[in-house]
Amino acid sequence: MEGSSKGLRKGAWTAEEDSLLRLCIDKYGEGKWHQVPLRAGLNRCRKSCRLRWLNYLKPSIKRGRLSNDEVDLLLRLHKLLGNRWSLIAGRLPGRTANDVKNYWNTHLSKKHESSCCKSKMKKKNIISPPTTPVQKIGVFKPRPRSFSVNNGCSHLNGLPEVDLIPSCLGLKKNNVCENSITCNKDDEKDDFVNNLMNGDNMWLENLLGENQEADAIVPEATTAEHGATLAFDVEQLWSLFDGETVELD
């Protein structure tokens, strides 16, 4: 280093060194600090001479506590510039950067931190609204009705089952299951045939009764035509029910 290589003195300044530095600055003025140690006859580096003059020996330096106006200005400048003490001291006449930094760290730093914390807490309380529990609202989505056919049996999805067996067929409801309608084709066919036979008998009886009443009123000349009507072939009637087409003369 510069001091160790040249054997320069370090540490506290003596009163003799301070007087030599004052005489040199009064004679040659401030500046050209690299020539000050040689002119003053000091075994100090140029940086040490400059800092000693600017921080302690300069006549315009103010000593003592800062006034209220200076403290207010210091707070504003620190909020704007941060810890740039040399820039802050340049805006406080008669105050050095070292004095401003020491005063801040000793008297104002703790108060500033506490005030900042309080302001942040107030902002959080103002910005964040009181949290209220969110109420969940159940939404019922409509389900489309679909008609599905499974194994020859029909039912509506999502709806109670409907009895799809016509009452005219005479089928019992014992053949209906919980989920689908089961059908027995043989029993259904037998019931269907029995119903048809019962209907045929009733139709023939009604037909015969009407013919008998007509015989009592119509003259004997129409008996031949009535006999021809009664001679309707039963086999042709059965063929009609079986699905065969028969041409009648």
UniProtKB/Swiss-Prot annotation:
Pfam families: Myb_DNA-binding. One of its GO terms (molecular function) is DNA binding. Gene3D superfamilies: Homeodomain-like (1.10.10.60). Its main location: nucleus. The keyword Chaperone does not apply. One of its GO terms (biological process) is regulation of DNA-templated transcription. Residues 33-57, 85-108 bind DNA. InterPro entries: Homeodomain-like_sf, Myb_dom, Myb_TF_plants, SANT/Myb. Residues 5-57, 58-112 form the HTH myb-type domain. Interacts with BHLH12/MYC1, BHLH1/GL3/MYC6, BHLH2/EGL3/MYC146, and BHLH42/TT8. Transcription activator, when associated with BHLH12/MYC1, EGL3, or GL3. Promotes the synthesis of phenylpropanoid-derived compounds such as anthocyanins. PANTHER family: TRANSCRIPTION FACTOR MYB8-RELATED-RELATED, TRANSCRIPTION FACTOR MYB90. This is Transcription factor MYB90. It comes from Arabidopsis thaliana. The gene is MYB90.
